[in-house]
Amino acid sequence: MHQSEFDPHSKEVVARAPLDPHLKALENEAIHIFREVAGEFDNPVMLYSIGKDSSVLLHLARKAFYPGRVPFPLLHIDTGWKFKEMIAFRDEMAKRYDLDLVVHTNPRGKTEGVTPFSHGSALYTDIMKTEALRQALDAGKYDAAFGGARRDEEASRAKERIYSFRTPDHKWDPRNQRPELWNVYNGMIRRGESVRAFPLSNWTEVDIWRYIQAENIPLVPLYFAEKRPFIERDGMMILAEDERLELLPGEKVQHGSIRFRTLGCFPLTGALRSEARTLDDVIAELEIATVSERQGRAIDRDQSGSMEKKKREGYF
């Protein structure tokens, strides 16, 4: 048996082997959430960070509204410090799928010269990501924002609802969230409030990768192992391909087979040594992994309880 599905690289309908029941159930839930939010809210937007979860989210959004266009814009908060491969991939996807892409950079951060090196990861993230996101959401007057967060990623995300309610200044109070009964979501909001909606809440990292494999979803190549230059700093392997990266005393550029489990700003994202060059290799590697994928993100450990503090202030 085969089912008719659209080719992720075009709008053509092709024969594709059916998903296994577990992935199909997750897909159905995510598509239901997309359609519920699109039907309930006046002005939704999808937060697009270009990583593997965003790629799956985009694929599901296209499925949810196929054969029409994705009926809401994609919002990318560009800090100016993303991997160059990410920006090239973002622009390619927007062109390929005829997406309404909104890109925002915090003008205050640009004027003040805020960088991960000059201001440290905590202040840099607050200005260039959290503050920038609040600016963009206010400018677009969006009342709902889709995000690709999953409950298995990190402790504070584990307690977040699928509909995560935010105050008029985009803050999150985990003690003041509404109950969710099965797949019944309450989208009623007060004036000025908004919702972050998370269609991938119940997916695991391995689910994401198996779905990418089953659906042939394109990804940024940094997720796959390749011989690359890097330096070791603060317990992380930092990619050394950007001329803005200045070596500290005692540091030297090394070369080795590395890849990334998660993608963010290059100075704050650590690689891992790996030989996983294919989807099968990546999945096999993850099935025996003993640490979280976000162990390689400096912003998750720059202060005690850092992710929850960031989310309370309006972070993704």
UniProtKB/Swiss-Prot annotation:
Pathway: Sulfur metabolism; hydrogen sulfide biosynthesis; sulfite from sulfate: step 1/3. InterPro entries: PAPS_reduct_dom, Rossmann-like_a/b/a_fold, SO4_adenylTrfase_ssu, Sulfate_adenylyltrnsfr_sub2. GO terms for molecular function: ATP binding; sulfate adenylyltransferase (ATP) activity. It comes from Allorhizobium ampelinum (strain ATCC BAA-846 / DSM 112012 / S4) (Agrobacterium vitis (strain S4)). This is Sulfate adenylyltransferase subunit 2. With CysN forms the ATP sulfurylase (ATPS) that catalyzes the adenylation of sulfate producing adenosine 5'-phosphosulfate (APS) and diphosphate, the first enzymatic step in sulfur assimilation pathway. APS synthesis involves the formation of a high-energy phosphoric-sulfuric acid anhydride bond driven by GTP hydrolysis by CysN coupled to ATP hydrolysis by CysD. Gene3D superfamilies: HUPs. Its EC number is 2.7.7.4. Residues 297-316 are annotated as: Disordered. Heterodimer composed of CysD, the smaller subunit, and CysN. GO terms for biological process: hydrogen sulfide biosynthetic process; sulfate assimilation. SUPFAM superfamilies: Adenine nucleotide alpha hydrolases-like. It comes from the Bacteria. The keyword Nucleotide-binding applies. It catalyses: sulfate + ATP + H(+) = adenosine 5'-phosphosulfate + diphosphate. Belongs to the PAPS reductase family. CysD subfamily. Keywords: ATP-binding, Nucleotide-binding, Nucleotidyltransferase, Transferase. It is an enzyme of class 2 (transferase).
